Amino acid sequence: MSNLLKEFNEQQMKLLSNKEIPKFSAGDTLRVSMKIFDGVSERIQVFEGVCIKRRNNGLHSSFTLRKISYNESIQLQVFLYSPTVESIEVVKFGKVRRAKLYYMLSLFGKSARIKERSNVARHAS
């Protein structure tokens, strides 16, 4: 039964992987364009923030973005293969030493800054 489920997930990933997904990790600043449905109209909303965690789990892969707007911390969990995700763009590559940046949740202002990575050639897709 698990092999059947695994094959189904792989088929769905192939169908949904027509959009280009860049290589990124925690600490990178991302710009995600998502489709938003307002009643009968549809528009694209852009969310830009720091990736605080990435979860690679096949079809259920996701990542969490965090940004500070008007002194409020906003977190958005985005599923990688969601049909509402229009595009993902890496704005900045961050230099961090952790895979999950949960310590960032309590930081604001200058203490929440992340250094920029200089060797981005090996991480570019």
UniProtKB/Swiss-Prot annotation:
GO terms for biological process: translation. Coiled coil: none annotated. GO terms for molecular function: structural constituent of ribosome. GO terms for cellular component: cytosolic large ribosomal subunit. Keywords: Ribonucleoprotein, Ribosomal protein. It comes from the Bacteria. Belongs to the bacterial ribosomal protein bL19 family. This is Large ribosomal subunit protein bL19.
